[in-house]
């Protein structure tokens, strides 16, 4: 049974965050951050854009990369960079609740994979949230009370995926509620805070919520949102359980059926 530190903020991942980004380059800026961390390089954003978009004529400061950025595109770009520099790396979706590329793992299994990746130097995690990409650089797992000394945690139970904090003597102390598990996220955006913390409870809700409903990881205090006809998002005062179902029901609008959310966590590894 592998032990993990109760809290971790990796300096190597943090030092490689490519900030600030261009207005529409969040996916590429995150990819630069991840690539530099995994392969100990100092590639710039412009160098990356020149490799990925050799025929681009527009000024990248104003070019909208958004329509070309997707989960599959980011993984393909990573492969292109590896081939360009003669390096070996792989990527895969660690946690996705909806769509054709959804993962088969449970929420608990996904958390275990995330904690494991953050304790592996040759791994990096990309978080696709609402109209944005950012990087998971650490976590902190809080005890339920302040007077329980605990420096480590383990995943145990019948499925091997139940997170428990350990007492100082190594015995299992307590299960951990999702609201006491915080993921530390780095943002490349110029106008946003460079670091923020999101509970695992929030991240799970974000990834599992179906359109036209969504959560905004950059403004989690807004709560559940609904997409409007003008493509903006407004707060919704309803029970989120009604829209977080992962059943077969779908939301329909003029023009057809809305697909499942593309929000997910993608892992990258240097071989």
Curated annotation (Swiss-Prot):
It comes from the Eukaryota. Belongs to the BIVM family. This is Basic immunoglobulin-like variable motif-containing protein. It comes from Giardia intestinalis (strain ATCC 50803 / WB clone C6) (Giardia lamblia). The gene is BIVM.
